[in-house]
Amino acid sequence: MKAMPWNWTCLLSHLLMVGMGSSTLLTRQPAPLSQKQRSFVTFRGEPAEGFNHLVVDERTGHIYLGAVNRIYKLSSDLKVLVTHETGPDEDNPKCYPPRIVQTCNEPLTTTNNVNKMLLIDYKENRLIACGSLYQGICKLLRLEDLFKLGEPYHKKEHYLSGVNESGSVFGVIVSYSNLDDKLFIATAVDGKPEYFPTISSRKLTKNSEADGMFAYVFHDEFVASMIKIPSDTFTIIPDFDIYYVYGFSSGNFVYFLTLQPEMVSPPGSTTKEQVYTSKLVRLCKEDTAFNSYVEVPIGCERSGVEYRLLQAAYLSKAGAVLGRTLGVHPDDDLLFTVFSKGQKRKMKSLDESALCIFILKQINDRIKERLQSCYRGEGTLDLAWLKVKDIPCSSALLTIDDNFCGLDMNAPLGVSDMVRGIPVFTEDRDRMTSVIAYVYKNHSLAFVGTKSGKLKKIRVDGPRGNALQYETVQVVDPGPVLRDMAFSKDHEQLYIMSERQLTRVPVESCGQYQSCGECLGSGDPHCGWCVLHNTCTRKERCERSKEPRRFASEMKQCVRLTVHPNNISVSQYNVLLVLETYNVPELSAGVNCTFEDLSEMDGLVVGNQIQCYSPAAKEVPRIITENGDHHVVQLQLKSKETGMTFASTSFVFYNCSVHNSCLSCVESPYRCHWCKYRHVCTHDPKTCSFQEGRVKLPEDCPQLLRVDKILVPVEVIKPITLKAKNLPQPQSGQRGYECILNIQGSEQRVPALRFNSSSVQCQNTSYSYEGMEINNLPVELTVVWNGHFNIDNPAQNKVHLYKCGAMRESCGLCLKADPDFACGWCQGPGQCTLRQHCPAQESQWLELSGAKSKCTNPRITEIIPVTGPREGGTKVTIRGENLGLEFRDIASHVKVAGVECSPLVDGYIPAEQIVCEMGEAKPSQHAGFVEICVAVCRPEFMARSSQLYYFMTLTLSDLKPSRGPMSGGTQVTITGTNLNAGSNVVVMFGKQPCLFHRRSPSYIVCNTTSSDEVLEMKVSVQVDRAKIHQDLVFQYVEDPTIVRIEPEWSIVSGNTPIAVWGTHLDLIQNPQIRAKHGGKEHINICEVLNATEMTCQAPALALGPDHQSDLTERPEEFGFILDNVQSLLILNKTNFTYYPNPVFEAFGPSGILELKPGTPIILKGKNLIPPVAGGNVKLNYTVLVGEKPCTVTVSDVQLLCESPNLIGRHKVMARVGGMEYSPGMVYIAPDSPLSLPAIVSIAVAGGLLIIFIVAVLIAYKRKSRESDLTLKRLQMQMDNLESRVALECKEAFAELQTDIHELTSDLDGAGIPFLDYRTYTMRVLFPGIEDHPVLRDLEVPGYRQERVEKGLKLFAQLINNKVFLLSFIRTLESQRSFSMRDRGNVASLIMTVLQSKLEYATDVLKQLLADLIDKNLESKNHPKLLLRRTESVAEKMLTNWFTFLLYKFLKECAGEPLFSLFCAIKQQMEKGPIDAITGEARYSLSEDKLIRQQIDYKTLVLSCVSPDNANSPEVPVKILNCDTITQVKEKILDAIFKNVPCSHRPKAADMDLEWRQGSGARMILQDEDITTKIENDWKRLNTLAHYQVPDGSVVALVSKQVTAYNAVNNSTVSRTSASKYENMIRYTGSPDSLRSRTPMITPDLESGVKMWHLVKNHEHGDQKEGDRGSKMVSEIYLTRLLATKGTLQKFVDDLFETIFSTAHRGSALPLAIKYMFDFLDEQADKHGIHDPHVRHTWKSNCLPLRFWVNMIKNPQFVFDIHKNSITDACLSVVAQTFMDSCSTSEHRLGKDSPSNKLLYAKDIPSYKNWVERYYSDIGKMPAISDQDMNAYLAEQSRMHMNEFNTMSALSEIFSYVGKYSEEILGPLDHDDQCGKQKLAYKLEQVITLMSLDS
């Protein structure tokens, strides 16, 4: 996008409000529609990641999805609940052990972590996720929130396998009730058998971090619970491995299904080749030594086709129906498997595949037989890959039963004979790739995924014992479907996964079937017909389905209707209809009858009959509006109980009157009669005028009979006689018969005579028609009587008018005419005529049947071709006139250039054409004429051509191109001479034909066909019998491939450029790109650049008018047409997407936009930038104003065009891709001309001005030199300023784009230093007080102790009295001297006293809040101000109440994102310079704490020696060379004590930084020493740059000491630096919140010397000019706020999302929040407050602003951390954003708004939506009963009842009684309730006891 010119005044607001677009991680959109046009809930992850594994929690229904670099936890509707990142990371597969254990010398690269195994350990409530990084270590994650419980990686047992293929590992958990579980793991080893066992059993310890996690169940020097592949195996099969497809446990055994290579000899061959064999492996669960290992080959066969390559498997039960067929129990285990054809292609399996069933019991029986035979000593162990040599079985006397687990002999064991499964379903084109199965109502169902992304639903126990595929659905695009499929918790949904997409599909789609027949004929056992609801559904979803005939589950149970009568005439009304019903349930509620959309009427139910009436007369016209003699309507029955139509049958209304012929009338299937004398059709025969005029049968109709062809020559008068039957005799007053001929559109009527009922004759007449180009004209003939009564003509008799002379200009053509025409050749005039039209001399007229019927004077008009090879074989075509009438006339009388040419029967056309084949010419023959004789060779029967025929010699010289793809389709041009000679060309490349296309004298063009192999082939050309030889070679090479296309999107109108990379692309001559959408193919052109690159224009989609323009489209097929290469027609590996076309708005209603010259043209619209993931895309727009293009700048909603230098009216045209649009015209007005008076005035003023200028010039001259110098100086400053601005903007942009990976990887998994409950609550309740009295025992002199304790116990009783406590609080609050601090203190003290009685405390709090609400509303304050500030005891108590009750939520859920945000801010701030004096930083969210000038700095990496252990490894620490020494010490301490809480670390002030320079040289570095620079009363703190410490230096932190080095400066430096600076950085005694806003180092003001570090304090004005210059446009540095905000965005979003989610990371909403929000809603209802904004504000003031803002601004209340001033400032900006998000008011922002408001302006609307949704979700939750809440509060009280000293707290509260005793006693005396309980007396007792001195 073109850069916009700088506008300093709006730069910040523009960048902050527009620049930060939020990117969406996940999208939810409909999956591609299936054949049945259904959409499904779909989840897609990050574009760069692929999905690997899927597992569903059977207890919760949550889905865990293993992907590349991520684990997702999804809800059942595929919404993301939690995401856990697992990669990428730096690794190398050759690093063993991995680099996280020891240093690796191999080069490290960023490596993805492929999820290889995903298992739920239900017993310990955790997820086991194993990846490919670090040799295959596993994480154990908590199911609720994916919190990492453990990640063992320090032992070799922890490395499962380094292979990164996701389908290569399988695990099975075996659970025990009282022991640790076992994990059986089977994995491919990727050629590293010495590192990884291929199969093993491991311990699953209860403790996820236990040392024994994943240890082998048994392991000693000789035996272990594992099997490794021997290294010898790899010498036989170098790429040997065992690939594990599926695993499960059943009974006492664990099973795995595998694919493994082996070497076999094909039949009849001695050489061995590698094939893949599918095998089942079995192990005993309790076998620690793996002596029970047995493997057996499996496969299946159908119709002679072997299916041997296992693709997927699933264990299920048999079910009753399939069990009966197989002869097994319904609960027996069946193994459903998918195999592909053959054994050779593992990676590219053939598409032919089969679904097969194995009965597990039969496999076990086969294994038992093998064990028994081996223990009898028969055969060998037969396990070639494990035992390279054949080891014979050993005999042993023992009984082997079904549960035999082997001995240390005869083990492990292989079975040689294959166990064959039962094939139940095969698929030849779309390979099956996954399977899952279950039993539904005794039926066994399998769901199979395919290569193309379809789901096949198969009823395995289909009719007649065959499997029935009853539905196919397109689910994922692109495919294939991956192996892992899973049912939802209720088995009603199926989760299906491809590499890029997870889709939820219902196991049944009953709702798609619209009728009972469709429903029950579908074969889906889930579906039945809910009769009275007229819907296909599951039985349990149908109301009252158990009642008779209300639910049909078999076809014979469908409702059927018959109606009597089933048709009536449209002229009949209110006819009684009787409907016979079958399978109809009881209809006591009544039934209505309807005829489709006509009115309803009540039906009368009589037994199994229903009586209805046909529609009334007024409704019939609505029926007969359509054409035709009948209209079918649905007669429907509608249940009054359900209001649904439940049965219908077809009913016909017929209309006889539409028939206008007898035959159509009486042949109608309805009761129609023909009245032949009235010529009408009627349903009522009584309306016919004569009894004999009624016709009911077709044979009684008047009609013409079939006659032979009626031939009538033109201009010849003759009658036409016709045969007929049943011709009526016209009655009195009726007219007679006529014939009507329709000749070339005009009607000719001829009188006709009826001889009798069977004959009629058209009278003598002549006929004619126009034109000589028609020799035979068929004419329609109609016979009518009485003017318009037609006689039926069922035989469609026609009259044929003909002209002999038409198109028969020669004798031969004349005599070829149909003999029935009686035409002949009249020789005199040379015409074709009838005999009577030829002059009388008979000899002049020739006819075909005559004895002398030979035409003379043959003539040759054309010969083709005129050249041919001497060798002959050329087929010469000779055209002319009179070339004989029979083939025998010319059979032996043709010569071409003197060479015999043999005529061919196939090519002969009598009289017109001869085709003959040339013989071989002699060398002496070169050219000649064509000569023929017709019958006899007399002059009058001979002809010679005017053209010459030439004999040619053909040669070849070259061919281009000389290479092409194996698939063919290359257009090859072969050059040479005379190549157009002859008639037939055959081109061969070796044995492959090249299909002839065209030729000329100099070239032949042909298209190559496909070849099976890559090789060079000789080119041969044969023309007729001439074979042309030349050493030309054509080379077949590998087909082109497509590796990558970019971009993978276009707009719907297409024509966007697409770059394509591949191989051999230069072979293609006519490349095209294609997309198939909506069944239509769309194509566009490509251009090849070189062998590996080409460019294409995306094809446009043709979308219908009803298409929604804002929808994203995915083509069904996308690929390339590359000559004849079929494999790239559909490119499966691309995810090509079409985005909506840009849409522009017109220039207002008038379509004209008026502008001034130079004003930009703005075109508004939408979709101007495609919403592509990543967002960094653009379209090439061209905007023409008139004919001139303009410079374009684009945003998503507008297009800005810099108008060209034009005036007047011009059309604006925008073009992009394949579309163009004109929003209208633009009128650019010229500047208006000036009037004459104005011109005169200007001239006079100009003259005076010139005089004045002349006078001034003299004075100006003197100043010119000085001005020049000043101008140069200013120009130099401007240049410097411009350079700084450009550099800063460039840096800010680069920072904005920086990936936050480093930040997230540093934070992931670090321990969170939560404060304990007591410290946390103290920091909130009593901020700033470290050692509060409530934390220690009450200190009372011994002589007073007993009385004081007694008094406090009595006082405690009063505090626990609600009446007293409320009166006490109200009284205190009414005192003017009772300050805000006092109110907060009393609230906190009361809550500490009532910590053990939270039920009571809650009751008091609710009463106080209710009083506060009443008071607020009575004082007529705005309701929104309630709880806004802490002005009452109740408000502070509310804060404390949430503090107590949300601690668990903080620890388990919200604490993690809050701590991550704090760490992220701290790390981001420390990446750049931080001023130790002012606290300003390069990276900041706060404008107030931003360094506003350029600071030059470098990042150093120092190696630090630990202060605790000098021998420990050096720790690398990143430091900035501009850091002060104290800052360096802080960073080193952070690095060394990374996971140590702040309070347990050494203080920087207690340590010295020692620089070790080698050879024992050591130097103590300090912030101030004798080397510190002082300049003009400014003293600058020392930095690493000051000491010139280089990168890579070794430093150490040592305890504070006075050395000889700094002894000289000790008296001044140590005092200054230690007391003034270092102690300001870290000290104890008050919480961090009280000093978080102080600068890190305080200037030494007493000495008059001003301290500075990076920036001199803004308040001092004595800066150098250069310094001022560097700050001249300091606002430009505000762009760094954007960079910082962008980096921290993820952490802010995570925190806000966690707080505003009702269920996040597995934690439910705390009860306290729901309880308090419900209380506020009750109060609002009570006071009639229904304004949702007020309720929203109350809740926001109650929880987010009262509790969460406090936690965000003060994370040190929750964690043991140190918060510096810059971090505090940033947290304040986040807290302000949090507050704005909870507000209901709109914030109007502009360029003058505070930067922290602008910074998050774009995010706040979405945050507000989160808050509103949060409050709404809480409101929808079921209310919490007081009983449940009290139980919860009692539990909280019990857990923390001893945290505070109650006596000390009571003593603190009592101090307020002492201060306000009279005021407190007064209300107690006057209040009736208090008086009854003698509360005043009891308080006086307390006062007395507490005040006694002795």
Swiss-Prot record:
<feature type="domain" description="IPT/TIG 4">
    <location>
        <begin position="1142"/>
        <end position="1230"/>
    </location>
</feature>
<dbReference type="InterPro" id="IPR014756">
    <property type="entry name" value="Ig_E-set"/>
</dbReference>
<keyword id="KW-0812">Transmembrane</keyword>
<dbReference type="InterPro" id="IPR041019">
    <property type="entry name" value="TIG1_plexin"/>
</dbReference>
<dbReference type="InterPro" id="IPR002165">
    <property type="entry name" value="Plexin_repeat"/>
</dbReference>
<keyword id="KW-1133">Transmembrane helix</keyword>
<feature type="topological domain" description="Extracellular">
    <location>
        <begin position="24"/>
        <end position="1237"/>
    </location>
</feature>
<feature type="glycosylation site" description="N-linked (GlcNAc...) asparagine">
    <location>
        <position position="1180"/>
    </location>
</feature>
<comment type="similarity">
    <text>Belongs to the plexin family.</text>
</comment>
<feature type="domain" description="PSI 2">
    <location>
        <begin position="655"/>
        <end position="702"/>
    </location>
</feature>
<feature type="disulfide bond">
    <location>
        <begin position="510"/>
        <end position="527"/>
    </location>
</feature>
<feature type="disulfide bond">
    <location>
        <begin position="516"/>
        <end position="558"/>
    </location>
</feature>
<feature type="domain" description="IPT/TIG 3">
    <location>
        <begin position="1040"/>
        <end position="1139"/>
    </location>
</feature>
<protein>
    <recommendedName>
        <fullName>Plexin-A4</fullName>
    </recommendedName>
</protein>
<feature type="domain" description="PSI 1">
    <location>
        <begin position="509"/>
        <end position="559"/>
    </location>
</feature>
<dbReference type="GO" id="GO:0021637">
    <property type="term" value="P:trigeminal nerve structural organization"/>
</dbReference>
<dbReference type="InterPro" id="IPR016201">
    <property type="entry name" value="PSI"/>
</dbReference>
<feature type="signal peptide">
    <location>
        <begin position="1"/>
        <end position="23"/>
    </location>
</feature>
<feature type="disulfide bond">
    <location>
        <begin position="130"/>
        <end position="138"/>
    </location>
</feature>
<dbReference type="GO" id="GO:0007416">
    <property type="term" value="P:synapse assembly"/>
</dbReference>
<dbReference type="InterPro" id="IPR008936">
    <property type="entry name" value="Rho_GTPase_activation_prot"/>
</dbReference>
<dbReference type="GO" id="GO:0099558">
    <property type="term" value="P:maintenance of synapse structure"/>
</dbReference>
<dbReference type="InterPro" id="IPR001627">
    <property type="entry name" value="Semap_dom"/>
</dbReference>
<feature type="transmembrane region" description="Helical">
    <location>
        <begin position="1238"/>
        <end position="1258"/>
    </location>
</feature>
<keyword id="KW-0472">Membrane</keyword>
<dbReference type="GO" id="GO:0017154">
    <property type="term" value="F:semaphorin receptor activity"/>
</dbReference>
<dbReference type="Pfam" id="PF01437">
    <property type="entry name" value="PSI"/>
</dbReference>
<dbReference type="Pfam" id="PF24479">
    <property type="entry name" value="PSI_PlexinA-B"/>
</dbReference>
<feature type="disulfide bond">
    <location>
        <begin position="374"/>
        <end position="393"/>
    </location>
</feature>
<dbReference type="GO" id="GO:0021784">
    <property type="term" value="P:postganglionic parasympathetic fiber development"/>
</dbReference>
<dbReference type="GO" id="GO:0048841">
    <property type="term" value="P:regulation of axon extension involved in axon guidance"/>
</dbReference>
<dbReference type="InterPro" id="IPR002909">
    <property type="entry name" value="IPT_dom"/>
</dbReference>
<dbReference type="GO" id="GO:0007411">
    <property type="term" value="P:axon guidance"/>
</dbReference>
<dbReference type="GO" id="GO:0150053">
    <property type="term" value="C:cerebellar climbing fiber to Purkinje cell synapse"/>
</dbReference>
<feature type="disulfide bond">
    <location>
        <begin position="530"/>
        <end position="542"/>
    </location>
</feature>
<feature type="modified residue" description="N6-acetyllysine">
    <location>
        <position position="1350"/>
    </location>
</feature>
<keyword id="KW-0675">Receptor</keyword>
<dbReference type="GO" id="GO:0005886">
    <property type="term" value="C:plasma membrane"/>
</dbReference>
<dbReference type="InterPro" id="IPR046800">
    <property type="entry name" value="Plexin_RBD"/>
</dbReference>
<feature type="disulfide bond">
    <location>
        <begin position="300"/>
        <end position="356"/>
    </location>
</feature>
<feature type="glycosylation site" description="N-linked (GlcNAc...) asparagine">
    <location>
        <position position="655"/>
    </location>
</feature>
<dbReference type="GO" id="GO:0021785">
    <property type="term" value="P:branchiomotor neuron axon guidance"/>
</dbReference>
